[in-house]
């Protein structure tokens, strides 16, 4: 299975609709809280990487699944932020593609040379 951005947003809309009375929907003023919850999930991703390590993530199916579940939680909260601000899959895809094209032309070493005293 390969989920598209529209699929992710649709699934998250379905979850939000199911819990509308408890969670309050996705008005713009909820975006900040959803982003903060997502940062908490990023902390869980960091914990797995820090405590389990690369080798276990690559070779232990249980650890790998746990990492992926936490990454999915992060993506779900990002989808909530998009829903809160009414960002469509098409709008996001357009901006993402443009950002990628711009990044492909950037010279990150030169842009950040001052941070590394000339060492990449």
Model-inferred region functions:
Residues 1-120:
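Flexible "arm" and connector segments at domain edges
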């Amino acid at each position: 299975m390969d989920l598209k951005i529209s699929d992710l947003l649709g699934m998250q809309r379905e979850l939000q609709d199911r819990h509308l009375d408890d969670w309050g929907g996705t008005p713009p003023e909820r975006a900040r809280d959803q982003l903060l919850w997502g940062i908490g999930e990023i902390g869980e991703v960091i914990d797995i990487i820090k405590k389990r390590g690369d080798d276990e993530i690559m070779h232990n199916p249980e650890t790998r699944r746990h990492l992926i579940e936490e990454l999915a939680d992060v993506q779900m909260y990002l989808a909530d932020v998009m829903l809160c601000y009414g960002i469509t899959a098409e709008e996001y895809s357009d901006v993402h593609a443009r950002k990628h094209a711009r990044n492909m032309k950037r010279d990150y070493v030169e842009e950040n040379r001052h941070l590394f005293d000339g060492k990449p």
